[in-house]
From Swiss-Prot:
GO terms for biological process: DNA biosynthetic process; DNA-templated transcription; regulation of cell cycle; regulation of transcription by RNA polymerase II. Belongs to the lin-9 family. The modification Phosphothreonine is found at T96, T304. This is Protein lin-9 homolog. The modification N-acetylalanine is found at A2. Residues 355-413 form a coiled coil. PANTHER family: LIN-9, PROTEIN LIN-9 HOMOLOG. Its main location: nucleus. GO terms for molecular function: DNA binding. It comes from the Eukaryota. It comes from Macaca fascicularis. Keywords: Acetylation, Cell cycle, Coiled coil, DNA synthesis, Isopeptide bond, Nucleus, Phosphoprotein, Tumor suppressor, Ubl conjugation. GO terms for cellular component: nucleoplasm; transcription repressor complex. There is a cross-link at K21 (Glycyl lysine isopeptide (Lys-Gly) (interchain with G-Cter in SUMO2)).
Length: 542
């Protein structure tokens, strides 16, 4: 009976059910009911504190939880304080990696790249030639297929279920099969060939090249610093310089910088320019088509070459060429869309530049040797001085020959200007003629502003008009922005005309006060780039 008296009454049980349904129990009920749920204390030999084991009922109701069997602690558990994560800005005071650790990582990376497979993986992953860059760095096949299949899909943030639905609609892709790889290689070769045709302006209809990117890279030129893939004994990437371009076989002749590699012929899809390369929109190739040379080209000035050309006899390259019978034809014959005589001059120009480059290299080495001898207070031998003087004299002769060839090439370029989309101009150029007319009007107006002429000498008035015309030409060149070799050389021709009309005693004054300043302005306008060779004073007075 005493045990029955200790059990809770019915009202207490009902109150407990109501409080349990509401989600909380009263503290009084917990204190009263917890005394009945205590279990015996198991004491062991090595257990100092008492461990309380909860009593487990055999049957449980789905309306009750384990909280009824567990002693409820009135004290709230200790909570860990939340630390607000505030993004910190990177400062210079942050700890940097240890130098030894960095060296260790760099050493391991270097050893990794020495492995042939790792080296090839880096090449395949990051090395793209100029002709392949727009093909591989654009949209992949999945993006292109997505645009064609779902043109109204403007977003790319879809759920996994939506992407799965799109993949089921598009079908299962065919990958990693021999037929797939062969098809991809064939498509890549076709795109490369189309880009080459665009670069060489051999396209009649641009609508057939819609599968190409919007920007087409321009072909590399001679003298460009490149990184090329070399195969064979020295397999890898090496830096060098382009010495020749073979458009027929789509290759470049590259001279490598590393000693012992020499010069090799590299395909264009394994040559990458070290500098940012220019591109041209594909639509521009359709707008600037070269017109037919037989119908749309204006009449040319024909040069009458001698019966036996000294170039053919003295040049071993052209003399032994199988094209000799074709090259020795008349000036009206063309080869590759250009006059044969023009191609001969370009070939000779290239050879002269190559020889001049070798002489400059020798001269640079001799200057270094002379500086070493001077620093050691050692005398310079007569043989050394003789060799140095010989190179200087040969360079002088090369410059004269180079100027003659450049003059002929410039004449042909002037004739070929209409074929390249440029407006034909008469010599002297239109800009020079306009500037001279405007200068004469300005000088005439300023001279007669007071009612009577201030300068009565006609020679002085003409000299002032010509000097004013030079200032107007410089102004037009600076404001125009589109500087070409014809307009640039017209400025030099104006200076030469003025120098030929003044007295010999005033030439030194003209050079010190006018010509040298105009030369500085020319250098600033053109940056002495590709126009410098064509802007050189003509020493060919034949």
């Amino acid at each position: 009976m005493a045990e029955l008296d200790q059990l809770p009454d019915e009202s207490s049980s009902a109150k407990a059910l109501v409080s349990l349904k509401e989600g909380s129990l009263s503290n009084t009920w917990n204190e009263k009911y917890s005394s009945l749920q205590k279990t015996p204390v198991w004491k062991g030999r090595n257990t100092s504190p008492a461990v309380e084991m909860p009593f487990r009922n055999s049957k449980r109701s789905r309306l009750f939880s384990d909280e009824d069997d567990r002693q409820i602690n009135t004290r709230s558990p200790k909570r860990n304080q939340r630390v607000a994560m505030v993004p910190q800005k990177f400062t210079a005071t942050m700890s940097t990696p240890d130098k030894k650790a960095s060296q260790k990582i760099g050493f391991r990376l270097r050893n990794l790249l020495k492995l042939p497979k790792a080296h090839k993986w880096c090449i395949y992953e990051w090395f793209y030639s100029n002709i392949d860059k727009p093909l591989f760095e654009g949209d992949n096949d999945f993006c292109v297929c997505l645009k064609e299949s779902f043109p109204n899909l403007k977003t790319r943030k879809l759920t996994r279920v939506e992407w799965g639905k799109i993949r089921r609609l598009m079908g299962k892709p065919r990958r990693c099969s021999s037929a797939f790889f062969e098809e991809e290689r064939s498509a890549l070769k076709q795109k490369r060939q189309k880009i080459r045709l665009l670069q060489q302006r051999k396209v009649a209809d641009v609508s057939q090249f819609k599968d190409l990117p919007d920007e087409i890279p321009l072909p590399l030129v001679i003298g460009t610093k490149v990184t090329a893939r070399l195969r064979g004994v020295h397999d890898g990437l090496f830096t060098g310089q382009i010495d020749a371009v073979d458009t027929l076989n789509a290759t470049y002749r590259v001279t490598f910088d590393r000693t012992g590699l020499g010069t090799h012929t590299i395909p264009d899809y394994e040559v990458l320019s070290n500098e940012p390369h220019e591109t041209m929109p594909i639509a521009a190739f359709g707008q600037k088509q070269r017109p037919s040379r037989f119908f749309m080209t204006p009449p040319r000035l024909h040069y009458t070459p001698p019966l036996q050309s000294p170039i053919m006899d003295n040049d071993p390259l052209l003399g032994q060429s199988p094209w000799r019978s074709k090259i020795s034809g008349s000036d009206t014959e063309t080869l590759g869309g250009f006059p044969v005589e023009f191609l001969i001059q370009v070939t000779r120009l290239s050879k002269i530049l190559m020889i001049k480059k070798e002489h400059i290299k020798k001269l640079r080495e001799m200057n270094t040797d002379a500086e070493k001898l001077k620093s050691y207070s050692m005398p310079i031998s007569i043989e050394f001085q003789r060799r140095y003087a010989t190179i200087v004299l040969e360079l002088e002769q090369l410059n004269k020959d180079l100027n003659k060839v450049l003059h002929k090439v410039q004449q042909y370029c002037y004739e070929l200007a209409p074929d390249q989309g440029l407006q034909p101009a008469d010599q002297p150029t239109d800009m020079r003629r306009r500037c001279e007319e405007e200068a004469q009007e300005i000088v005439r107006h300023a001279n007669s502003s007071t009612g009577q002429p201030c300068v009565e000498n006609e020679n002085l008035t003409d000299l002032i008009s010509r000097l004013t015309a030079i200032l107007l030409q410089i102004k037009c060149l600076a404001e125009g922005g589109d500087l070409n070799s014809f307009e640039f050389k017209s400025l030099t021709d104006s200076l030469n005309d003025i120098k030929s009309t003044i007295d010999a005693s005033n030439i030194s004054c003209f050079q010190n006060n006018v010509e040298i300043h105009v030369a500085h302005i020319q250098s600033g306008l053109s940056q002495m780039g590709n126009l410098h060779a064509f802007a050189a004073n003509n020493t060919n007075r034949d």
